Amino acid sequence: MRNDRPVRITRGSGDLYVYATGITTLSTNFPDDLGKSPSTLPEISTASMSALSFLYSQLFVEPPVPTHDFQGQTVIITGSNRGIGFEAARHLLRLNVSRLILAARSAEKGQIAADTLEQLTGRSGVIQVEELDMANQESVQEFATRMEMCRIDAVLLNAGIYTHDFVWADNHESTLTVNVINTFLLAILLLPALRRSSKTWVIQPCISFVASDRHVMYDLPEWKTQNTFQVLNDRQQARMHERYPISKLLEILLARAMAKQLDSNPPNGTGNIIVNSFTPGYCTSGLIENVHGITGFALWLLSKATARTTEVGGRTLVAAIAQGDKSHGKYLNDGHIDESALSPFVRSQEGILAMEKLWEELMEILEQKRPGIGLLLSPVP
């Protein structure tokens, strides 16, 4: 006889009843009291529910194969020479994308990826390889300049790093630089090209930030300090084992802030630029190759037990840029809009206050990198 009791998880159109004794035990046995009202079932902590929700998504949900037609469209993917970025590129080629810009830190590796994609899909003359080092603001600004006159229908901001080593890059801890600061530097610098594309081709471009469901693990108490980024840049205080999920929490909050900023500065006579963020789920990729020791081993075990393939993860990238304006300012999970998958902190009033404060801090940092960048958030009359 089991002493633990069932917990009900609702995701999408279905319910899952599991036994929870903490956050590690998962069973799909159906108990005798399955028919009881959910209100009679025991409550568990937010952390436990988040873990169970994650397991449900990883084990029982498979994002659908995308079918949206991208004919005539140009899509940029950062971090596209391997992993889910590479698989998203393969899906887009299958879905008739007319121009695919692969942005990779190494032009050589980017070209190898392009050659492989052409062989796999039989499509040639579609891929354009561009060098982009997200750890270097000059590389980011040069890339944005090269894109100024391009038609751009969608930007998938997928490039990111996962490391437990505290390393400086562009005057900030490298995870913050790559996953957050320079990612938003690029997003804002591309706005003029996106607005030009919107007006010229009567389209509604999309910027999509690849986040992570691991953002639910932390509530970022540092947001209450005078300068959050300064605290996160303190080597002595840095908790690097938390840095990746914290960077993704920052990315989600700031993506929502950016969407709000664009809403307050709508363009004249054209549709708004769509901004969203999403989780691809936990996928087998090279992202954790720089994580070693017991944490690396734990992540390896988790990958073996629950991880999606990069092909399945790549589906979520394509889904994020195919949702249309209904996804503006929203969060996607398993390939569809799912605000309930956000952490309680993000959805709380405290989360909104943190979002507004962090946006101000981010813009101060970006103004130092590119004076006047804030003006790009408002369209030219």
UniProtKB/Swiss-Prot annotation:
Phenotypic effect of disruption: Does not affect the annullatin D biosynthesis pathway.
Alphabetized GO MF terms: oxidoreductase activity
Catalytic site positions: 244 (proton acceptor), 244 (proton donor), 248 (lowers pka of active site tyr)
Enzyme Commission (EC) number: 1.1.1.-
Alphabetically ordered keywords of this record: NADP, Oxidoreductase
Binding site for NADP(+): 84, 109, 133, 158, 244, 248
PANTHER family noted in UniProt: PHOSPHATIDYLINOSITOL-GLYCAN BIOSYNTHESIS CLASS F PROTEIN, PHOSPHATIDYLINOSITOL-GLYCAN BIOSYNTHESIS CLASS F PROTEIN-RELATED
General function of this protein: Highly reducing polyketide synthase; part of the gene cluster that mediates the biosynthesis of annullatin D, an alkylated aromatic polyketide with a fused dihydrobenzofuran lactone ring system that exhibits potent agonistic activities toward the cannabinoid receptors. AnuD does not seem to play a role within the pathway.
Protein name per its UniProtKB record: Short-chain dehydrogenase anuD
Origin species: Penicillium roqueforti (strain FM164)
